Amino acid sequence: MELWDLYDENRNLLGKTHVRGVPLQEGEYHIVTDIWLVRPDGKLLITKRHPKKIWGNMWECTGGSALAGESSKHSAARELAEEVGVVADPEELELLDTIRIKDRFVDTYVVVRNLETADLTLQAEEVIDAKFVDFTELNQIWQDNNLVPRERFLQYREALRNFVEKNKKANN
């Protein structure tokens, strides 16, 4: 049973937990983290969701819900390790964006690693494929309706593009 901490609309901890899968009450929110792994050459890691999951066979960045008692950064680092086998210190993660959407606060992080897909260990029940794409390819996947969740990506797309470009310049 997965438990989440609950927050109010101002992201103040409510002092109660919630069981995943049970609808939230109005005014209750939980934290979700997205994490983009970016290579020094500017390519981004995307993973393909397991076909039995909601949005199955679609591409996404790594992410998930923060567990009760877990900080946003620790959640992102845990999801990165669980889903693709990449260990990162939470303090290495750079917050790219925070948005409140529906019943959640979504914190989007980036971390830079010089990896190939062969370096990854995919979590079989979550992820069936992974690849590194440049920003143009990523945008095309989004335009083709093959990247989820669509509305979140649209919110931080320019911030992600700027991070990728800045990172590429710093590594050339």
Question: Locations of the language-model features?
Answer:
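Acidic, metal-coordinating catalytic segment for phosphate/diphosphate chemistry
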Residues: 1-34, 38-40
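A residue-level structural signature of the nucleotidyltransferase/glycosyltransferase Rossmann-like core
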Residues: 4, 28, 43-44, 58, ...
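Conserved hydrophobic "DFG−1" position in protein kinase catalytic cores
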Residues: 6, 37, 46, 110-111, ...
